[in-house]
């Protein structure tokens, strides 16, 4: 069966037996298979799991106490070493606090991107280097190709599981050290391989939720920072007061359900104003836009975005199939994106990820 899972050498001109690989093991099936496969192929595998928070509920997240035990069991059954590193303090300070800050600013965060950006691909990558390992491997569904001293990043062959959207902030320097061996395979086959290896996580469900949110994100914010949940007005697009809300952290742009207003026509959240603590609602027509601005851009091409604009495809959320657009650079690592064929809900705090076909070019945060 292993003949169906051939991968390119992780390090050029270096045999598997002389290549030390750190695999970031979340306790899920994907990273477990990545570690097991590389071990079977002869690589010197070291499994590392990051203890990010204390959660034993097992409610569809990752990197909690139960997941750590799952990863440890996989490593033990396959016969390679495994270590757990406690990153709870860094995770709380840089991911959870950022998550709350973003909501209180009237934006909708993506904590998984932030975790990849500052915990896995910064701190863990540095730890990997300090161990003398050759590469850091993850179970993400994304493809990376190095050719002519340039790095190309592509969507996964399994488009339903593609995770390139969540890795847009990964820098070229980080990508040089990272490997994604599952990018050319489909999830169904990865589960078959997990069964072939007799891994205890072979039937484990995919993580669906934000890992540290065991109830709802609203209750999580109310518990961790209750002073941020303040009552305020719900207004229409003309500024008329329609009702009262229990905190702007309970709303996201584009939200329709749970607004708490009775109306003949559907109402959507069109704006969140943290300065006045107001939630603006209106018809869907007031929500759709074809122009957006992004900041903190991570650009993977050697050539910068031309001032005349670049024709691209953009994804404004992970499930978005993509829209044709033109991106124009601005000062201070910002850009303007003009959608060409459609109007979309533009949600500040989310990511706008830029593609040329299935090649990811980079992206930025919607502001």
From Swiss-Prot:
Binding site for ATP: 24-31, 50, 139
Keywords carried by this UniProt record: ATP-binding, Cytoplasm, Disulfide bond, Nucleotide-binding, RNA-binding, Transferase, tRNA processing, tRNA-binding
Swiss-Prot/TrEMBL catalytic activity: S-sulfanyl-L-cysteinyl-[protein] + uridine(34) in tRNA + AH2 + ATP = 2-thiouridine(34) in tRNA + L-cysteinyl-[protein] + A + AMP + diphosphate + H(+)
Entry-linked Gene3D superfamilies: Adenine nucleotide alpha hydrolases-like domains (2.30.30.280), HUPs (3.40.50.620), Translation factors (2.40.30.10)
Keyword Repressor attached: no
One annotated GO biological process: tRNA wobble position uridine thiolation
Enzyme Commission code: 2.8.1.13
SUPFAM superfamilies referenced in this protein's UniProt entry, alphabetically: Adenine nucleotide alpha hydrolases-like (SSF52402)
NCBIfam families, sorted: PRK00143.1 (NF001138), trmU (TIGR00420)
Role, per record: Catalyzes the 2-thiolation of uridine at the wobble position (U34) of tRNA, leading to the formation of s(2)U34.
Record-given protein name: tRNA-specific 2-thiouridylase MnmA
Species for this entry: Ehrlichia canis (strain Jake)
Higher taxonomy: Bacteria, Pseudomonadati, Pseudomonadota, Alphaproteobacteria, Rickettsiales
